[in-house]
Amino acid sequence: MHKTSEQTLIFEISKAGRVAYSLPLPTVDEVAAEELLPAHLLRQEDVELPEVSELDLVRHYTALSNRNHGVDSGFYPLGSCTMKYNPKINEDMARLPGFAHIHPLQPVESVQGALGLMYDLQEKLAVITGMDEVTLQPAAGAHGEWTGLMLIKAYHHARGDFKRTKVLVPDSAHGTNPASASVAGFDTVTVLSDERGLVDLADLKSKVGEDTAALMLTNPNTLGLFESDIVEIAKAVHEAGGKLYYDGANSNAIMGIARPGDMGFDVVHLNLHKTFTGPHGGGGPGSGPVGVKKDLIPYLPKPIVAKTAEGFVLDYDRPESIGRVKPFYGNFGINVRAYSYIRTMGGAGLARVSKEAVLNANYMLARLKGAYDAPYDVYCKHEFVLSGRRQKALGVRTLDIAKRLLDFGYHPPTIYFPLNVEECIMIEPTETESKETLDDFCDAMLQIAKEVEETPDVVLNAPHTTVVKRMDETLAARKPILRYQPKQEVHV
């Protein structure tokens, strides 16, 4: 059977002798590789690279690109990921020659504009979060978590307090929290949630103590609920001598409305590729700046951009610093995009962003909670969780619902996270989606709920319209095929 271009590997359309590009003539004398490299470094067999024409190359990758789904092609309600629209003006700003055509090793006097942007971004992020100083070095959220925990470790060790080896993490936390704590050399202690979906204060107080380095907390949490006991939580941690760490993954709910620093947090990381519209994933990279209160400033990674009478400089004179956490000064291009977004929106605009993100989430929750179980039937913040346990009782799981959504042209929400909600469906619409889009998605979810009751096989066998149908995900995880292996010719 003939395979379409979407089903064929580029290796499978290779024909010997075909080329996609004519290389220019060399401008230097040609020298054989054997004259330059020792024999053990030379390839003994031809490399198996595809030989295709330019037209075949373009058609192949264009077909593959049409299978991608991103915020520019459709609704992307991935909970706890803030898949908001990335304004294209940010791309224009990042491509300005003064930002795009410079090198981090240039003399500082020749990159004053870039350093000025970095300094102003540090200042603005400090104001937004209620922190006293910010570093732009961390490359993404988990990297920011690790950096923040290393700052906390440096703080405790500088005080001769080496017994603080434990980091408390709620059972609803992002998986990166315990992972970052482990990589930073801490032991993780899980704090339970109560019947409200919030931190169980009694459980927290029974576990915080002289060995506590920090509590990592997201507020609002991953259930989309605001930790209303945050002042008492901060008091319990601080009285035990620990620090309070803010995972900024859900900051889109509180910008311009509440600040982590005012809640009692000592360290904050932000995800500029989420909350502040830097592109995600293949459109990245990310950026995870970390802000701290005054007593942690000495330990920040160096250098920090500082302002002097002569201009902006890179301040390396920080003897207590934990050192660099990334080459140079962070993912500068994403920082430019975030700065453009902040300057465009202004303080009032950022507050409106959060209000509309919360409004959109509550609107969707109100429409869907009749067809799906809502474990916490209260007002949410920027995201909310549903449970597919009602559908599971009819033989259809959350995974099946997610697969069926593909037929409607939607990227599925986050599923099976947080772990403390059975058959979890986690939805975050963000502020950039219209009511019409929200209604269309809710209509699809309601139709699927009806199908589960009336025609379950339609859901169980979904997706029906995508190029790739159901895969054996267990086999793919256990026996992945990670590279192309040409079939061996059989000679009779």
UniProtKB/Swiss-Prot annotation:
UniProt record, GO biological process: glycine decarboxylation via glycine cleavage system
Major enzyme class: oxidoreductase
Q: What is its EC number?
A: 1.4.4.2
Annotated SUPFAM superfamilies? PLP-dependent transferases
Write out the entry's keywords from A to Z.
Oxidoreductase, Pyridoxal phosphate
Which GO terms of the cellular component aspect does the record hold? Answer: cytosol; glycine cleavage complex
Residue positions where N6-(pyridoxal phosphate)lysine is found in the record:
K274
What cofactor requirement does the entry state? pyridoxal 5'-phosphate
Reactions mediated catalytically: N(6)-[(R)-lipoyl]-L-lysyl-[glycine-cleavage complex H protein] + glycine + H(+) = N(6)-[(R)-S(8)-aminomethyldihydrolipoyl]-L-lysyl-[glycine-cleavage complex H protein] + CO2
Task: Answer yes or no on keyword Oxidoreductase.
Answer: yes
Task: Please state the span of the N-terminal signal peptide per the UniProt entry.
Answer: none
Pfam families in alphabetical order: GcvP2_C (PF21478), GDC-P (PF02347)
**What terms describe the molecular function in GO for this protein?**
glycine binding; glycine dehydrogenase (decarboxylating) activity; pyridoxal phosphate binding
Per the record, the similarity remark reads: Belongs to the GcvP family. C-terminal subunit subfamily.
Q: Which NCBIfam families match?
A: PRK04366.1
Q: How does it assemble?
A: The glycine cleavage system is composed of four proteins: P, T, L and H. In this organism, the P 'protein' is a heterodimer of two subunits.
Q: Which PANTHER family match?
A: GLYCINE DEHYDROGENASE (DECARBOXYLATING), MITOCHONDRIAL, GLYCINE DEHYDROGENASE, DECARBOXYLATING
Q: Any idea what job this protein has?
A: The glycine cleavage system catalyzes the degradation of glycine. The P protein binds the alpha-amino group of glycine through its pyridoxal phosphate cofactor; CO(2) is released and the remaining methylamine moiety is then transferred to the lipoamide cofactor of the H protein.
Q: How is this protein named in the record?
A: Probable glycine dehydrogenase (decarboxylating) subunit 2
Its taxonomic path starts at:
Bacteria, Bacillati, Bacillota, Bacilli, Bacillales
